């Protein structure tokens, strides 16, 4: 993707986001403020859902940091023969650790374009939390974790944009580690499709044997 096209796309997204009429409020849960839509009676429950998903992500990120020896000295890394200093896995994990920022998470309204999306590798993340038909019904926590890992993979995919093949390989790598860490239960959506904010989900790269693995 050319820089000019990328700039145009960012401008379009920002114009959509900041030109919308959505009103949000900040609700404090577990010492952190969450930006959720204010025109629902269960806004506090939405903030709690975000907090619980974030807590899973924090455990997952700590697992990745430890497994791939991020921010360790060269000497410490050298003592672990299975994970040398410069590997593709460490670059992916480092990009995710550097870019993940819950302070710029915002609830996104169901039925809007994109359902959930990330701007500029983590500058902002808009996350749909509600059923499209019954908007007082919050999404399933496991589905939300899958979506959060999807958005996290956009951050981790440090040298790519969009949903090209490389993104799906990175997403598979992230899912494999999330399952290994115990923070995400693998769900085969090809066998058990689910609705997410009006989007029909019928694919999980974790189960795609034709998709290349990034060695863990």
Where are these regions (language model features)?
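Helix-boundary capping/turn motifs
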Residues: 140-145
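Feature marks short, highly hydrophobic, charge-poor N-terminal signal-anchor/signal peptide-like helices
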Residues: 1-7
């Amino acid at each position: 993707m050319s820089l000019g096209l990328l700039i145009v796309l960012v401008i379009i997204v920002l114009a959509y986001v900041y030109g919308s009429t959505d009103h949000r409020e900040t609700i404090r849960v577990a010492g952190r403020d969450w930006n959720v839509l204010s025109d629902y009676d269960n806004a506090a429950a939405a903030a709690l859902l975000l907090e619980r998903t974030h807590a899973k992500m924090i455990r997952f990120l700590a697992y990745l940091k430890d497994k791939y020896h991020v921010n360790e000295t060269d000497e410490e890394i050298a003592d672990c023969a299975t994970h040398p200093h410069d590997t593709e896995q460490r670059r992916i994990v480092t990009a995710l650790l550097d870019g993940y920022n819950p302070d710029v998470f915002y609830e996104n309204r169901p039925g809007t374009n994109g359902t959930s999306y990330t701007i500029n590798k983590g500058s902002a993340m808009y996350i749909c939390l509600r059923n499209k038909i019954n908007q007082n019904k919050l999404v399933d926590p496991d589905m939300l974790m899958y979506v959060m890992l999807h958005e996290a993979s956009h951050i981790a995919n440090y040298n790519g944009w969009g949903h090209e093949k490389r993104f799906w390989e990175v997403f598979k790598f992230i899912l494999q580690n999330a399952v290994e860490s115990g923070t995400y239960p693998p769900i085969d959506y090809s066998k058990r499709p689910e609705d997410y904010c009006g989007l029909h989900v019928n694919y999980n790269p974790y189960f795609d044997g034709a998709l290349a693995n990034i060695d863990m």
